[in-house]
Amino acid sequence: MHFTVEAQKIVADHLLPGNIAIDATAGNGHDTVFLANTVGPHGKVHAIDIQGQAIERLQQTLSQLDLLERVEVYAADHALIEQVVAPKLSSFVDCAMFNLGYLPHSDKSITTHRASTLRAVEGAYRLLKPGGMMTVLAYVGHPGGRDEAEGVSAWLESHADDLRVDRIQDESNPQSPILWVINKNP
C-alpha cells in the first residue's frame, strides 16, 4: 500500500471545491498540488515547510502548474501553524494533511520531531472546523520516527471525545508507516 496515495484518496472523498486546506508539511509539494487541484480555483491551500529548498521547489512546481493563486506558501516550522495561518483565514479549515519524517532526496538529519509535530497537530486541530478532517502520516523507520508516532497516538487518545480516528497500518510489518484519518466531531 502506498500510504500517501491512500491519504489523498480519503481526503478526495471529503474535500470539496471552494474549501480551505492546509498542507502542514509541504515537502516536495505532492500533497499541496493535490489539495490545490481538489479545492479548485475558488478554494485555498496553506502550505508550510521549514526548509528553504522545499519552499523553492514547491513555488516552482506551483508556478509551472499555474496553481500559485490557490496556495499561500509559508517558510516556517509547522509547530507555528496556528500563528502563521490563522491571520490569513476567513473561516475554519476543512482539511489538514501531515506527511511526517524528512524531505525525500535531501538531508535525512532534518526531520519532523515529536514536540513540534504535537504543537502542529494541536494547532491544526484548533483551526479545523467541526466535521473537518485531518490526516497524519508517520514513518516509524527513521530515528525519532517511532517516538513521534507514539506522541501523535497519545495526543489522539487524549482527544478521543472530540474525534473519530481511523488508523491504517500494515500490521505484518513493524516498520510500516501509520496513517491516521481524523474527523473532528461536528
Question: Could you say what each language-model-derived stretch is?
Answer:
Residues 17-18, 40-43, 128-134:
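Short glycine-dipeptide loop
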Residues 27, 102-103, 139-143:
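Short "lid" loop at the C-terminus of a central beta-strand within the Rossmann-like core
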Residues 1-24, 30-33, 37-38, 55-91:
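S-adenosyl-L-methionine
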Residues 44-49:
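Conserved SAM-binding motif I beta-strand of class I
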Residues 98-120:
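Mobile active-site "lid"/loop adjacent to the S-adenosyl-L-methionine
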Residues 25, 120, 127-138:
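Conserved beta-strand signature within the Rossmann-like core of class I S-adenosyl-L-methionine
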Residues 142-186:
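Class I S-adenosyl-L-methionine
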